[in-house]
Amino acid sequence: MTVGVLQLELSIPSAFSLKDKRQVVKSLKDRIGHAHNVSVAEVGALDEHRRSIVAVAMVSNDKRYVEGALSKLVDYVRLDPEAVLQDYQIELL
């Protein structure tokens, strides 16, 4: 069994309040979760309106599948017009 964790550090330049940020983050979390069958949560920078840290988790019996799927998720997030990907980390357990 392989557990993959992807941590995304995002910048949200269009957010002028926490409400604006939450709309962008919720939309991104919903799209990621529904399209890729993963668990998604905002885990950091909760009180900063222009920054967010989002974690994505996935479990599979195939290590290569998890690594590939999380890499594709990084590419998917890079295409988001409202959230700018600043950094990411993939960890396989």
Predicted features by range, described:
Residues 2-6, 34-36, 50-54, 84-86:
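A generic structural signal for short beta-strands and their flanking turns/coil linkers
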Residues 3, 41-62, 91:
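Short, charge-patterned binding micro-sites
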Residues 4-13, 18:
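Short glycine-/aliphatic-rich beta-strand segments at the starts of folded cytosolic domains
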Residues 17, 27, 31-33, 37-44, ...:
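Amphipathic alpha-helical assembly/interaction segments
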Residues 21:
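C-terminal binding/interaction regions
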Residues 58-93:
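C-terminal structural segments of small proteins and small subunits
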